[in-house]
Structure formats: structure tokens, C-alpha cells
């Protein structure tokens, strides 16, 4: 048994390297203590003031002594310049900064520690650096003192927190701040970029105000840093009081597109939710990772609904979170929301649409079931009860149950411990309605799993609710059923199949219900439950829609068909997109602008004549509306194949928002040589390491270079695997297997599946099986008769 109270850490940096001294206030009752330690040189260990024996093996520092009061460790470490995990070097413009990324298990690469979320402690940090360097950590600086040729920054002690939330940044940071009220909000960037952070500070202030009101608990630290990191594996990280971001996830200004502003706002809101839910109250173990991530996702959209009502964040939640999660959870190789994690190295595979999107969607479903205010009171009680401590999912359900006055834990247990979800088949006969449930899978496999489904539906205009906890139920009504719709406002995590299909049009649907209906029937097409004729009939019904979410969804579905078989589905995609352009061309509202941006981008890819016309605008690129810049760049790339011109443009830009547009454009060039050219740009870091998975995935959607890409990936897989895992962790490898290899399997299914089986290891087994499922599904759709 080990009880840890406090870490006192002193680090002396000399460029990338550092000497460390830490004193850990702790107590152990065994004859040895095991700490986590990776890549650190341990020089001396003292227990209660006396030198003791120790050894390092299997990512552990083993100290052969009982500890009654204090463990003192002298060690050295080095910021990694090949990886972007742990403590690492992030280069930019001929300079660099040192930064950290510890979630889930990388604090052990920084200091010897008990690197587990339940081992909370207070951290007191002091750092000695060269003059001219600035240092940022979780807490405010309490002193800066000269120390010879260097300067020592001393930080205030943190509240009790987990190791994965500790942060250290060293570099030439440029800062702007908002000190209008507590907490002080500071935005830190690399030189020359801070002015693009004003929008982020404004969003952060509004979101904090919203959360303080919702949670009835003030933000707990004196300050909050929002930090732009030039190389970053994740999108952002919720280090308590020192949140780190990719540039593209933090910076936006008046020149940015609507989608960029929305994305930045959503990421900031997500990470700020963690300051309460994840940082102040933390999961006990990684089994409950989903609770951290799903709640932050859920709350982010709630806050944006209040702050930016014009963006209709609930629609974005359904589009970006629920629909993505439903798709991933349709696989036989999905996993329950709550997954038992034995080996910490398994954790990274849990950062997926199930932990984020499905978990958040289940929270939305339960909120709809118990009511918004009851749900909020349950959350407030939970946060107060476990403040500065650790908790589990069952603790949250108990708090919500207390507020509700009835036990919901059984319903929640159904949804977090069982994989998948049901399709609800709706049959109407005269004055009766029958609901029938079975698990939905894209491979259409029989599965007898029964879920407790909070059904919401409307019969003849009257709202109804039902907890469907068996295979089927038949309801009788006073009058013949003339209209019905199921899954109101799309709060439920299930699909709805109407028998006959025409029932789906019997009621008036709102924009979210239309979105859900079309996505359901798209997936029924993929699963072979409905014909291509039925699907296209549905799409035709919405060909003139002004529902921006629906327009983007149909465009996405038709583009997927195009990527699977461009010759067969080209005209279907083109005709829909051409019609939609007329509707959104002069859109003034933000959602309309987003839809127009998506539609012209897609049309440029499928229609060469349209691309040629649109490409003429590229000469005026800097003066263009930011919402169409991406589409114009892609059109130019397709029409000219001007790799060098686009690369020069990429190098000339100072913002990642613009650089990413150029990357997307280059990946659409229809010249096979771009595969090797782009690979070299990533390997030599002209394109940031963090973009490697994105570059490969974007290339795989280009049918003109796909075969070349697949040959490159398969022929160099061991080298690519080592590179991606080194620079971005296992997540990057999962991304490459699940994205590009699926499209390789569209071209050559047998060869790709054989390759996947050959490279399959324990770490990537689930990703391999997921990819094989998609290959089977897409090849069935590829060969449908129109």
C-alpha cells in the first residue's frame, strides 16, 4: 500500500537535457516501492534521508526500502526531439520550445512517479532555465530569481491532481491576457501569433461563466493558460490550468472560416469542461476514460448552444458525435463504452468515437429521459461529493438517480457494458403499432442482445414515451394510426426502420429528425437491409433541402459512394451537388456558409468542369472569402497538378489553418508521384509530424493515386509503423490502419485482407478486424446494381 501526498520537483535545464531532484512525501508499508520511470537516468535514491538500493527494469524504478516520510530521487532526463509524447521538443521557424503531453502514461518519461490517475498528489515545481526563456506550468509563478547565468521559476503548489495533468512548457512564448475577472486567462503562442488568439480568450471567458453557473462551482485555480503548441499529437489536452492545443484547434480570427471558429470553440469548451470533470474530479482508472471524454464532449455542445445559438450546436452534436458513434458501434469489433483496461498500453485504443461520441450521446439520451434540471442537479451533487478526488461511472449514476428519485443505474449499465445498439423496426396495422428491436450491425449478423431503450415517439401528433426492455411490444390506440415518427429530436442512440418505408414520411420531421432518418437509411443500405433504390428515393425527396446538416450529410454519403466506385456513382453525386449549389450560393447565415463550403468542395472533386471554372479564383486566393478557400485550392490542384506552386504557398503561410488547406489540396492532385513527394515532406518535417496520419488518410480518398499509396504503405509498413508510433503514439497507427487500408481494400480486397492478417499483432488486432469489416461492407456497395 502506497500513500502519496506531495511531489517537490526541481529541474535544471541545459537546452534539451535536464537534471532533476524530486522529493516525494509519501508512505509505504511494503519492503519495496515501485514507481513508473521510462528513459530517465536514475542517479541516487534516498528513503527517509538514507541512500537505498534501487534498479530500473520494465518501465519501473524499483526502490528496495520501506518509506515512512520521504523518497528523494536524483535523476536526469532529456526532451525527445523525435517524438511528440512525454516531454519533447516542438520545433518552429528555426526555433523550438519544450513542452509536455502526459495522457495517458507519459508522465513517467518526465519524472519518476506513480503514474496512475488514482494516485493524486500535490505538485510543487521549480525550474532553472537560460535567461530569455519563459516557463509555464499548471499554477501561477510565485517567484523568479537570478541564479548565476540562469533564472529559476518557482510555481505555486497545485491542488491534489493526477500525474497525467501535470504540465511544463519552456520557450519564447508570446502572451496576451484577460484580467477582467477571475480567473486570469492567458493565451500563449509562438512569436507573432498571439493576436489570432483574441477570439479564443473571448470564447474561454464565456464558457467558464457558463460552467460556473451550470456546475455551481467556481473554476478552482487562480489562472488559466491556453497554449498553442507547434507540434502536438492530440487536438488539445486538458492539463489543469495549462491547456495545450494544436494551433489549428486554438487560433481563429475575423479571417477564419465559420467551420474553423466552430471547431476552435468546441475544442476550447471541451477542454474547459475537463477542468471540472476530469481534473477536479478524476476517473479512478482508465476503464472510465469514457466518462471523462464523453462528459466533456456533451458539455461542450451545451455551452455552445448558450453562447452561439446561431450555430445550432445540438445539430452539430448529432452530426459530428452521434452519427459517427452509431457508425463505429455498428461493427462486430466495437467495444462497450466501459472497457476493462489491464495493460496501460491498451489505453490509447480507447480514445475513439465510442468513448467520446457514444458516451456523450448516451448522456444526452439519459438527460432527455430524466429531464435537464434533474440531470444538472445530479451532476452538481456528484462534483461536490468527489471534489479533488476520484470517482467512477456508478458514482455519477447514483447522483443522478438521487436527483431523479428513481434508480437509473440499470438503464445506464445496459448501455455502458454492452457493445452496440438496436435498430427499432416500426410496424403499423390499423390502430396498432408494434416496435421490434434487434442489434444493428453493418454485416447484418443475427444477435439476440436486448437493450433497455428509452423510446420517444409521436402517434397522430401526440408525444409518447416507452421503456422498451424486451424484444417487441405492441401498442393499441383509440384511432387508426395515420402518422408516426420515432426517436424525437434524435435523442435516442438507436436507428429506426419503418415498415413500410413510406411511414417515414407520415409525420413532419424537424431538421435533426431528417438528418437522423437519412443517416439511418444510408446505414441500412450499407448493411443490406434496404435497397439502393429505396435509398435514392429518399435522397431525391430531399434534393432541394435547406437543412444545412442534412445537405452536408447527404453530400458526405454520396462522396463515400464516389470514393468507393467513382465511375458508378459519379453522376448521382454530381447531380445532387449541382442542385444544392443553387440553394446555398448566396447564403448569409453561418450554417448556410458551412453547407456551401462543403458542397463546392465535393463538387470540385467529382466534376472536372466545375473544378476548372472554380480554379480560376485561385489567382485571387488571399482576397477570397475564407469559407470557400479550401474548395478553390482543391479545384486548382485537380485542374493544374501544380505541386510546386501549392507547396510554395504552403511554406509561405504562417497559420496552420491556411497550411492545412494547402495539404488538402495537394492530396487531391491526380498524379501518382505525389505519394512519395508527400511522404518525404512528412519525414523531413516540412509538413509537421502531427499531420502524418491526416496526409495519408486524405490521399487514400483520392482514387487516382490510391493504388500507388497502397503499394507504398504495404511495401514500407514496418518503417511507417515505427515512424508513426514514435512521433504520435499508437493512436496514429490505428488511424492509418482504419482509414487508408479500408480504401486499399476497396481496390484490392483479397490482397489487402491478406496483408492485414500478416501485420496483425495484439496491439492493433481490433483495428485490423474493424478494417476488414469495412472492406466487406464497402465491396458489397461497390458492386450494387443501380
Swiss-Prot record:
Compartment annotation: Cytoplasm
Cofactor note: Binds 1 zinc ion per subunit.
Single GO term (MF): metalloaminopeptidase activity
E.C. numbers: 3.4.11.-
Annotated site (Transition state stabilizer): 356
Catalytic residues in the record: 271 (proton acceptor)
Keyword Translocase on entry: no
Pfam families, alphabetized: ERAP1_C, Peptidase_M1, Peptidase_M1_N
Protein name as it appears in the record: Probable aminopeptidase 1
Natural source organism: Sulfurisphaera tokodaii (strain DSM 16993 / JCM 10545 / NBRC 100140 / 7) (Sulfolobus tokodaii)
Gene encoding the protein: ape1
